[in-house]
Amino acid sequence: MAGREGVPILRNVRRLPDPTSRLLVASDAAHRLGGAVPSPAAAFLITLIVLPSLFWLVALKRTTGFTVPEEWLMTNLVPQVHSWVQTMAPPLDALLIGISGLGSGWFVAAGFGVLGLLALAKGRRDLALVLAAGTLAFPMEWALKFFTAIPPITPLQLLNALFDVREVGLDDLADFPAGHALRASVFYGLAAFCVARLAPDRRQGLTAYGVAVLLIGAISMTRIYLEAHYPIDVLGGWMAGAALVSVIVAVHVLGLAERIRAADALAAASDQRPRRVAVPLRHRRES
């Protein structure tokens, strides 16, 4: 019995897998591309598709407000579903409210800060810059709400709404775009991109993108469930967030590709230089 004191009791039990064990956090990983990282051309193509669509959606919102199917949905169906869930399944209602909070301004701002500091701690300044650029989602939301508000609002009203002066927030002044949908698209989209940059396995990156899409969709649907936004507002948040993410990703990947191309050209030039053969000094004297 004394000889068995140092033997672990659960020696045959496998350890839980570490989801971050296969991520590349070394400094040289910042200069490599691979996995599920999109190309700059694909990112810019998404931008070229989304931005004009967002423009026409803004024009539709300013001229019509909402469509007839949306009005029927938000008048006849959503309120009944919301009331039924509140009455028959209060835990589900609390869960949906909690999911909605994952796209709130304070949560997303804190998330950007935590992930940015984590990237710096791992020596990945490139990803920290990507996350810092993601905070542009906030002024982007404010600008879109300012220019699409009906009736128009003043800059002072917008400033007061940012701090909930007199309990009047941004959503009380302008519905378009849905701020939760926009912020969630940018935050979780860029977080998934960072995982794809760190993961050598393409499947890990695709899994991260899939989880991000599910989170964005769940957060956005809760805003409709809570009767805070019409579907057109949520669609506008998705488009605005996708446009910002695609621009940030394209700039990041294009800059990295240029650095890799320059390093390869420098290495090729150094290999093509004529090499001088070193001759020992005593051999020169004998000759």
Model regions and ranges:
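Transmembrane alpha-helix boundary/anchor motif
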Residues: 5-8, 53, 135, 139-143, ...
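Interfacial segments of alpha-helical transmembrane regions
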Residues: 43, 47, 112-140, 209
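N-terminal transmembrane-helix/juxtamembrane module of multi-pass inner/ER membrane proteins
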Residues: 2-110, 147-148, 152-168, 286
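Membrane-embedded catalytic cores of phosphoryl/pyrophosphoryl-handling enzymes
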Residues: 3, 158-285
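Hydrophobic alpha-helical transmembrane segments of integral membrane proteins
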Residues: 123-158, 214-231
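Hydrophobic alpha-helical transmembrane segments
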Residues: 57-58, 100-123, 185-189, 196, 223-224
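Hydrophobic, membrane-inserted alpha-helices
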Residues: 93-94, 109-117, 192-193, 215-220
